[in-house]
Amino acid sequence: MQMRKHLRLTAALTAGCLVLGALPCSALTVSAADFSANYAEAMQKSLYFYECQQAGPLPDWNEVEWRADSTMTDEVTGGWYDAGDHVKFNLPMAYSASMLAWGLYQYPDGLEKTGEMETYVNNLSFVLDYLAACDEGDTAVYQVGNGQMDHTWWGPVELLEYGMKDNGADYTKARAALRGTSSAVCGEMAAALAAGACALKGRSDKTGDYLKHAENLFRLADETRSDDDYNNSDASGFYRSSHFYDELFYAANWLYIATGEQSYLDKATSYIPNLGKELGSDELKYSWGMCW
């Protein structure tokens, strides 16, 4: 049965390709004038997504009518839930925050034209406040919530505590905060906060605090130069780190931009030999890091 379905599908696709091949080129030409995009609407919907993901006490500017306060007993409230889960994974969260910050830093005029500047700044500040709160000096919170336990229940996060108890799970363990000095996570958090300090300069009175935490988190990441604590935790089943020099490089660059201190540029340069290379080549590996 599966083979017959496969053959029918293949035949249909082949016939479709033959029909397209028989059409004159003029019939397949698409004019650039046929395409139009409302970038302001795309921006609004993107920011709305981040507001859907907000954890903890919701700010009064949150526009998602079906959301309410949640996970209010977390050791560190706020931040974003990951995907459709109820866990706060700081590695992808910090990367997303750094991209938001970079967008504002590089294209402020474009954001002004969309009419979404206030909403953008609000959402960026919301996640940066959380990342700053995760910095505890000699260690950092890199995850809140247990992914394995979280995946045993599907429902609205506002009812998570009841769902966990209904499953016979210990809610306190399900919302435990994981701490460490993982270079990848602390480095990414440092990059997000340093980029945020640059992007929000003149728009927020918190930039000095963001930069202070960025520098400390970078110190932890650089001194540790390991992801063992992170990769041996619940996080490894979801966002395992394969290396950390890319995050150190990324963070050092943003700290140089934010402070102008040569030492950060020197650090960034020193990491380059440790960045991944293409197989059988001396060329830097094309990976997520190429976005910068």
Language-model region placement:
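Bacterial N-terminal signal peptides that target proteins for export
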Residues: 2-14
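Hydrophobic core
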Residues: 14, 18-22
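Sec-dependent signal peptide cleavage junction
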Residues: 22-34
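Glycan-recognition and catalytic cores of secretory/periplasmic carbohydrate-active enzymes
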Residues: 32-292
